[in-house]
């Protein structure tokens, strides 16, 4: 997206500053530091990354939000973006046993029925995921 000239904001969240991953890599790609949140307040916003996202969404319009991480956090983020009618793509971290859709160990409940994360995902439209 950045190489295509799109404006991109990245929000990273972790329990502590030491647990933040890829901060330098995102800085190199973005040309500026990503937004960061730490649960303990040791770096950036003191609290969850959803707090940062909520603040950002109040400052300017967004065409899309993409999210990965723990499902409870993604659910919370999707509640925020859904209330603002912002399309949201989520990457679900499901265990994939076979990787070809045969074993059904990675199914995700959606408004269109069950989808296999390994074949149909792992990125899904958050509005279609049944939490």
Where are these regions (language model features)?
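FNR/FR-type flavoprotein reductase catalytic core
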Residues: 1-90
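Local cysteine-cluster metal-coordination motifs and their immediate loop/turn environment
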Residues: 71, 93-122
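Short microdomains enriched in Cys/His and/or Lys/Arg
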Residues: 119-131
